[in-house]
Amino acid sequence: MTQDSRFPNLFILDHPLIQHKLSHMRDRDTSTRTFRELLREITLLMGYEITRNLPMTTRRLTTPLVEIDAPVIAGKKLAIVPVLRAGIGMSDGLLELVPSARVGHIGVYRAEDHRPVEYLVRLPDLEDRVFILCDPMVATGYSAVHAVDVLKRRNVAGENIMFLALVAAPEGVQVFQDAHPDVKLYVASLDSHLNEHAYIVPGLGDAGDRLFGTKN
């Protein structure tokens, strides 16, 4: 895991398997089926990395031999909240890692001026949970900021929120950091820039279209 000195709350997950799978996802000739499978696999690997610092406590239990105080994750179960629609492709990988997690959804689409328009919010109870928001792309950063806003408006502390994405543009990371410096953003790659259409370069295209086999 590495950091970029420009963005204190950005963490780049540079594990070789993550980078290898991301390269295959970038390839324009990768099929919808393979893209979908890779998204699940890479999200599972990234989820393993970002959950390493979850708060722990102990629980008294009995093994076949003795009683012990065994380490367990503290608080309520994790909540996974994909940002629709592309984020839903990441939830399977996270649920494979944490099958007992609660799942919410935040639906956002991008208007012509690239600003987010919210159309759906469904969340589990919020108290004492750690939330993982997920969306494959942080391009302009507006949708990611909006998703965090949704949780913070409901009194979820920034320290209890993580945002997980595959690729991000520096422009979007700056917007995110300015809005939510207390929320950690985890990505597989910090790419070069946004083009005139607000697509990440080199990026991987429209993640939603490639995930679901649709045309923009």
From Swiss-Prot:
Q: Which GO terms describe its molecular function?
A: GTP binding; magnesium ion binding; uracil phosphoribosyltransferase activity
Activity regulation, per record: Allosterically activated by GTP.
Q: What is the top EC class of this enzyme, as a single word?
A: transferase
Superkingdom, according to UniProt?
Bacteria
Q: Sorted alphabetically, which keywords does the UniProt record give? A: Allosteric enzyme, Glycosyltransferase, GTP-binding, Magnesium, Nucleotide-binding, Transferase
Q: Which cysteines are joined by disulfide bonds?
A: none
* Record's cofactor remark: Binds 1 Mg(2+) ion per subunit. The magnesium is bound as Mg-PRPP.
Xref: SUPFAM superfamilies:
PRTase-like
Query: Which Pfam families does the entry mention?
Result: UPRTase (PF14681)
Binding-site residues, uracil: I200, G205, D206, A207
* Biological process (GO), any one: uracil salvage
**Which pathway does it serve?**
Pyrimidine metabolism; UMP biosynthesis via salvage pathway; UMP from uracil: step 1/1
- The EC number(s) attached to this protein equal 2.4.2.9
What are the names of the required cofactors? Mg(2+)
Kindly list the positions annotated as binding 5-phospho-alpha-D-ribose 1-diphosphate: R85, R110, D135, P136, M137, V138, A139, T140, G141, Y142, S143, D206
Q: Which reaction does it catalyse?
A: UMP + diphosphate = 5-phospho-alpha-D-ribose 1-diphosphate + uracil
Protein family: Belongs to the UPRTase family.
Q: What does this protein do?
A: Catalyzes the conversion of uracil and 5-phospho-alpha-D-ribose 1-diphosphate (PRPP) to UMP and diphosphate.
Q: Cite the HAMAP family for this sequence.
A: Upp_B (MF_01218_B)
User: What is the protein name given in its UniProt record?
Assistant: Uracil phosphoribosyltransferase
